[in-house]
């Protein structure tokens, strides 16, 4: 790659915040964005189910490599859980496994429903939904389920920082209970699993009927654009400098230290903890660096030598 084309790639590198509609898969969204943005180097920081809407954080060009360091950020969701019906996918698109009787549902109080959701808060062990993208012996769990296999994934630790029940409404036609919730959780949490587990705890079954992701780390859906808006203006939401500084605390470096990082060299530690965005006086975010022992080494170089 010559220097001119390298600079062109860097100028096109960054993050696009997209408001995903219900229907397409995250893979479908990437395919559409490749056409809109005019590059195949497109990737996202976390899958949204087809039925889900909301924030999809998309990396463009070198932004795809940057997003690998953002996937562990916490997330926020708004969702509707239907209590009274369990499905094999834990959402409305799955086959019905069980339906609670009207008598059992009418016996539940709103206080019991709220307490069952409250029990999900904090550091918990959660069993991922069987139709997740988690791989088992090289194959994704949802593919195995579609092939007819009985998939039960092991529990793993997640953190529910907050879970608020916004309202509880009874569907008069079915006696099912719809609970609208707001969740702030760690990466790797399955909201469908919360619906399933609350339904099981109440003895009536439960599944997800609506899901909207409202934030990923420092990125909020209020900044996101629809595919139609991006068709009209296929521009970055944040360039690479802006994205790195938003996601990470910074370490101020000299221009010469910036050159060293661009060449793959390490810097002297200054007592920082965690990953930092190394930023020059001119405002360029050169790399993400992390101190270990007597070195501050780069974990991602945004501007390799020749891309300045």
Swiss-Prot record:
<protein>
    <recommendedName>
        <fullName>tRNA pseudouridine synthase B</fullName>
        <ecNumber>5.4.99.25</ecNumber>
    </recommendedName>
</protein>
<dbReference type="InterPro" id="IPR015947">
    <property type="entry name" value="PUA-like_sf"/>
</dbReference>
<dbReference type="GO" id="GO:0160148">
    <property type="term" value="F:tRNA pseudouridine(55) synthase activity"/>
</dbReference>
<dbReference type="InterPro" id="IPR036974">
    <property type="entry name" value="PUA_sf"/>
</dbReference>
<dbReference type="Pfam" id="PF01509">
    <property type="entry name" value="TruB_N"/>
</dbReference>
<feature type="active site" description="Nucleophile">
    <location>
        <position position="49"/>
    </location>
</feature>
<dbReference type="GO" id="GO:0031119">
    <property type="term" value="P:tRNA pseudouridine synthesis"/>
</dbReference>
<dbReference type="InterPro" id="IPR014780">
    <property type="entry name" value="tRNA_psdUridine_synth_TruB"/>
</dbReference>
<dbReference type="Pfam" id="PF16198">
    <property type="entry name" value="TruB_C_2"/>
</dbReference>
<dbReference type="InterPro" id="IPR015225">
    <property type="entry name" value="tRNA_psdUridine_synth_fam2_C"/>
</dbReference>
<dbReference type="Pfam" id="PF09142">
    <property type="entry name" value="TruB_C"/>
</dbReference>
<comment type="similarity">
    <text>Belongs to the pseudouridine synthase TruB family. Type 1 subfamily.</text>
</comment>
<keyword id="KW-0819">tRNA processing</keyword>
<dbReference type="GO" id="GO:0003723">
    <property type="term" value="F:RNA binding"/>
</dbReference>
<dbReference type="InterPro" id="IPR032819">
    <property type="entry name" value="TruB_C"/>
</dbReference>
<dbReference type="InterPro" id="IPR020103">
    <property type="entry name" value="PsdUridine_synth_cat_dom_sf"/>
</dbReference>
<keyword id="KW-0413">Isomerase</keyword>
<dbReference type="GO" id="GO:1990481">
    <property type="term" value="P:mRNA pseudouridine synthesis"/>
</dbReference>
<dbReference type="InterPro" id="IPR002501">
    <property type="entry name" value="PsdUridine_synth_N"/>
</dbReference>
<comment type="function">
    <text>Responsible for synthesis of pseudouridine from uracil-55 in the psi GC loop of transfer RNAs.</text>
</comment>
<dbReference type="InterPro" id="IPR012960">
    <property type="entry name" value="Dyskerin-like"/>
</dbReference>
């Amino acid at each position: 790659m010559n220097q001119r084309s390298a600079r062109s790639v860097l100028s096109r590198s960054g993050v696009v915040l997209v408001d995903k509609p219900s229907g397409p898969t995250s893979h479908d969204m990437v395919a559409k964005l490749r056409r809109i943005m005019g590059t195949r180097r497109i990737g996202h920081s976390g899958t949204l189910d087809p039925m889900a809407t909301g924030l999809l954080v998309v990396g463009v060009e070198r932004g795809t490599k940057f997003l690998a360091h953002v996937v562990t950020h916490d997330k926020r969701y708004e969702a509707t859980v239907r209590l009274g019906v369990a499905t094999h996918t834990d959402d409305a698109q799955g086959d019905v496994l069980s339906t609670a009787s009207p008598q059992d549902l009418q016996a539940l109080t709103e206080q019991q429903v709220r307490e069952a959701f409250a029990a999900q808060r904090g550091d918990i062990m959660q069993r991922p939904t069987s139709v997740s993208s988690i791989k088992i012996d090289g194959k994704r769990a949802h593919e195995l389920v579609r092939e007819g296999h009985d998939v039960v994934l092991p529990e793993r630790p997640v953190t529910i920082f907050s879970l608020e029940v916004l309202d509880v409404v009874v569907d008069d036609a079915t006696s099912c209970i719809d609970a609208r919730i707001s969740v702030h959780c760690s990466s790797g949490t399955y909201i469908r699993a919360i619906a399933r587990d609350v339904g099981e705890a109440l003895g009536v079954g439960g599944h997800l009927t609506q899901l909207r992701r409202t934030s990923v780390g420092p990125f909020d859906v209020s900044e996101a654009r629809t595919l139609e808006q991006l068709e009209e203006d296929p521009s970055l939401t944040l360039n690479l400098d802006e994205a790195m500084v938003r996601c990470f605390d910074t370490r101020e470096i000299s221009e010469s230290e910036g050159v060293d990082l661009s060449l793959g060299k390490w810097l002297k530690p200054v007592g920082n903890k965690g990953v930092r965005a190394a930023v020059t006086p001119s405002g360029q975010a050169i790399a993400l660096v992390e101190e270990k022992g007597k070195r501050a080494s780069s974990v991602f170089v945004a501007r390799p030598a020749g891309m300045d």
